[in-house]
């Protein structure tokens, strides 16, 4: 890791993942990669990648680096990753907006699918799951983004995202796949951080808050199954 030269690319979903990395590597440029692809893990080491790889690349806010320096690093990454121009790899100076835009899907379909164990077509078929859970979460995410200064979303964005997945498959978002395998889910950056950012700005987010509580309960079961949580009441527990 060469200071002022080696570039770190974070392709994880969600918000506020860059803070610990910037603290640990203050002398390295940090790029934000917002990735869109479809993949299903059927068994260990067996993954069906059935959708093109699309990336939007930009820089995380980092006062240690001039904007032009990081822009050049982002374009260099694109040249390395996509040398033959066969992939849709785009430099996006407003990559934070792309992160919030992706959360409109990830913070709604992902957690609800994990909690219910349903694929996206079945959630759409049910109607009430869309009306009572998915669309309200999408609107809460957009409201939080706008309160945080990220704007420019089309009015019909929730309706576009609701209908984004094909209906002729039984596709389950990654969080649902993790839950079915008894694995850990990306709860905090996808759900917890957007919720906290919105609440800090005074945005009412009741649907996402309820879903967040349910996800933490599911995660607790995973921790217990792996010996990472032992049931019991510590001293001063309010519900003992």
Predicted ranges, named:
Residues 87-88, 119, 151, 204:
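Short coil/loop linkers at secondary-structure junctions
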Residues 45-75:
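Short beta-strand and adjoining strand-loop segment in the mid-core
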Residues 12, 34, 51, 61, ...:
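Residues at the C-termini of beta-strands that transition into short coil/loop
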Residues 1-48:
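Rossmann-like NAD(P)(H) cofactor-binding subdomain of soluble oxidoreductases
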Residues 1, 24, 84, 147-148, ...:
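Alpha-helical structural context
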Residues 68-114, 160:
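FAD/FMN-dependent oxidoreductases across multiple families
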Residues 124, 131-240:
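NAD(P)-dependent Rossmann-like dehydrogenase/reductase catalytic/cofactor-binding core
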Residues 96-123, 129-142, 169-170:
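Active-site-proximal catalytic alpha-helix in oxidoreductases
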């Amino acid at each position: 890791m060469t200071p002022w030269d080696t570039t770190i690319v974070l392709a994880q979903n969600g918000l506020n993942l860059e803070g610990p990395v910037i603290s640990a590597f203050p002398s390295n440029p940090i790029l934000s990669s917002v990735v869109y692809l479809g993949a299903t893990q059927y068994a260990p080491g067996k993954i069906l990648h059935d959708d093109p790889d699309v990336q939007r690349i930009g820089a995380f806010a980092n006062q240690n680096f001039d904007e032009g320096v990081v822009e050049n690093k982002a374009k260099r990454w694109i040249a390395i990753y996509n040398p033959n121009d066969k992939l849709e790899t785009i430099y996006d100076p407003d990559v934070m907006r792309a992160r919030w835009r992706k959360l409109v899907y990830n913070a709604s379909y992902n957690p609800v699918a994990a909690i219910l164990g349903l694929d996206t077509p079945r959630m759409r078929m049910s109607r009430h799951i869309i009306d009572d859970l998915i669309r309200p979460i999408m609107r809460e995410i957009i409201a939080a983004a706008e309160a945080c200064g990220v704007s420019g979303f089309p009015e019909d964005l929730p309706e576009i995202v609701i209908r984004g997945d094909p209906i002729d498959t039984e596709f389950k978002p990654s969080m649902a796949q993790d839950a079915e395998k008894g694995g850990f889910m990306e709860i905090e950056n996808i759900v917890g951080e957007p919720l906290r950012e919105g609440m800090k700005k005074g945005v009412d987010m009741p649907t996402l808050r309820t879903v967040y509580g349910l996800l933490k309960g599911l995660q607790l079961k995973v921790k217990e199954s792996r010996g990472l949580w032992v049931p019991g009441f510590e001293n001063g527990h309010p519900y003992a």
